[in-house]
């Protein structure tokens, strides 16, 4: 739900800063997090 989406956004930010969580960078982290959330 909404909370899950927020978690996904946070993960995406981490991906951008850290160099790519799940090898997806900001776009992959944000999109993947939202889908999973």
Swiss-Prot record:
Region feature Disordered, mapped onto this chain: 16-37
Parts forming coiled coils: none
Positions of post-translational Lysine amide modification: 36
Highest taxon of the lineage: Eukaryota
One Gene Ontology term, aspect cellular component: extracellular region
Keywords per UniProt: Amidation, Antibiotic, Antimicrobial, Fungicide, Immunity, Innate immunity, Secreted
Principal place of residence: secreted
Compartments in which it is found: Secreted
GO biological process: defense response to bacterium; defense response to fungus; innate immune response; killing of cells of another organism
The keyword Cytoplasm belongs to this UniProt entry's keyword annotation: no
Tissues showing expression: Expressed in hemocytes (at protein level).
Record family assignment: Belongs to the glycine-rich peptide family.
Function: Antimicrobial protein with activity against Gram-positive and Gram-negative bacteria, filamentous fungus, and yeast. Was tested against Micrococcus luteus A270 (MIC=0.5-1 uM), Echerichia coli SBS 363 (MIC=9-16 uM), Pseudomonas aeruginosa (MIC=0.01-0.3 uM), Aspergillus niger (MIC=3-6 uM), and Candida albicans MDM8 (MIC=1.5-3 uM). Has no hemolytic activity against human erythrocytes.
The protein's name in its UniProt record: Serrulin
């Amino acid at each position: 739900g909404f909370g899950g989406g927020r978690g996904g956004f946070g993960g995406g930010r981490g991906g951008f800063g850290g160099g790519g969580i799940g090898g997806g960078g900001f776009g992959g982290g944000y999109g993947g997090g939202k889908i999973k959330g």
